[in-house]
Amino acid sequence: RAGYAGVQRSAAVWTGDNHSWWEHIDLLSTMLMSLGLSGVAFCGGDVGGFQLNAAPELYARWIAAASLTPFFRAHSALDTRDHEPWSFGTDVLEIARRYVGLRYRLMPYLYTLFSEAARTGAPVMRPLVWEFPRDPRVQNRSDSFLIGPSLLVAPVSRAGVQERSVYLPAGVWYDVWTGERTVSGDPARPENGGRIVACDAPVDRIPLF
């Protein structure tokens, strides 16, 4: 949570003592994108929050989002609930297993992105404007992020949600879970923007394209 010039060369950085609040899932995305743009590519936050006690639904949503960030770990303060995946019951454990498995399947892609970050300084976790600079609708958007150029992640940061809206910039997108193909806007005219789509988002599924 503290650093100095050159810290990105030798260490991972985390966001500091976050809390088990839904708002801190939103802050996770914003802070990590900012760190990436500042040259700190290997960054993350404590899954479930460091302070207070995470509820099962909050933990499930958090681990889904955090599994797709550069630095991924669960951690908590001494006087709070344990934040290991098996501490929240079998349903949450299965969700955690799903996203840990997804991260392992993405390891070759992540390795490539970290290699690029080491060589060029490009962030691993990117705001949409990094890849779509001509789209005016993504200039201040932080409710979703990219992992490299090819994976759009839209975390759920509200309790009880079963669906969320996701903005897809101009292009052809595929839902990772269903394979459904969506053509958003005109790929030849990205300055005209894409469109917002409604995505199913039960507790075990993070919108992912």
Residue ranges and their predicted role:
Residues 1-207:
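Catalytic-domain carbohydrate-binding cleft regions of carbohydrate-active enzymes
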